[in-house]
Amino acid sequence: MQRTLSIIKPDAVKKNVVGKIIDRFESNGLRIAAAKKIKLSKCDAKAFYAVHKDRPFFNDLVDFMVSGPVVVMVLEGENAVAKNRELMGATNPKEAAPGTIRADFADSIDANAVHGSDSLENAVNEINFFFASREIC
């Protein structure tokens, strides 16, 4: 049983599609082991996305992630990392397969509705960034 981190980004929260996105996870065998709605600080957003700090889009990404509330979740299930990435679709919603979260709910490569851990190792680190072990059940 794997765990992965999912973030429903400010654009999707603003569009009020959180429930529809959660339904995609649950109807595809991913269980929500923890969830909370938060407003990221600029400091937290910079720390979370530090791997991208030298990329040209870093400041825009940070500004976007602090533009409104997000929903952070720990998803649990068989091959959770890969399954979540499959459900999300390509980073650019124009390239995302029909029926994926990004194809259905994202507006652009920047406002792309969701974040998901890209590896098991990153999933552990990302989960620990947002959740104490006692919050996950």
Curated annotation (Swiss-Prot):
What Pfam families does the database record attribute to this sequence? Answer: NDK
Needed cofactors: Mg(2+)
InterPro entries on file: NDK-like_dom, NDK-like_dom_sf, Nucleoside_diP_kinase, Nucleoside_diP_kinase_AS
Q: Which domain of life is it from?
A: Bacteria
Q: What is its EC number?
A: 2.7.4.6
The principal location of this protein is cytoplasm
Q: Where in the cell is it found?
A: Cytoplasm
* GO MF terms, alphabetically ordered: ATP binding; metal ion binding; nucleoside diphosphate kinase activity
For this record, the Gene Ontology CC terms, alphabetical, are: cytoplasm
Q: Which reaction is catalysed here?
A: a 2'-deoxyribonucleoside 5'-diphosphate + ATP = a 2'-deoxyribonucleoside 5'-triphosphate + ADP; a ribonucleoside 5'-diphosphate + ATP = a ribonucleoside 5'-triphosphate + ADP
Class of this enzyme: transferase
Catalytic residues at 115 (pros-phosphohistidine intermediate)
> What protein family is recorded?
Belongs to the NDK family.
- NCBIfam families listed in its UniProt record: PRK00668.1
Please give the name of this protein. Answer: Nucleoside diphosphate kinase
Organism of provenance: Campylobacter concisus (strain 13826)
